[in-house]
C-alpha cells in the first residue's frame, strides 16, 4: 500500500492566532469550509465541523479526559487520533493531519491518486 500524500492548506499564520475556546476547540476556515482544531496535551488535531451522527456542531462539544471529541447533542465520542467512534455506534468522524510550520498552521487534505486520481 502506498504512502498517503497530502495537499497542505494554511488555516492560520500562527498557532497563537487560533482562538481556542475554553473547551480547547477552535473553528477555522479551510478553503471556505468550517473545520475544527482541537488541542489535547501537546497534540493538535483537525476534524469535521459537524458530527456524522446528527450534525451537532462539534465546536460546542468538548474534549474528554482521554482526548476524545464529545458531541454536544447525544454525547457520541470520537478519537481525535483516528476519527473512530469510541462509544460503539460505528460512526466515523473525518479528520486530517495538522502541521505547525514557521509560515503558519497547515491542515493536510489527502490527494486522490491511482485509479480515481483523474476525478480531481
Regions from the PLM with identified roles:
Residues 67-71, 85, 105-109:
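Generic recognition of long tandem-repeat/solenoid scaffolds
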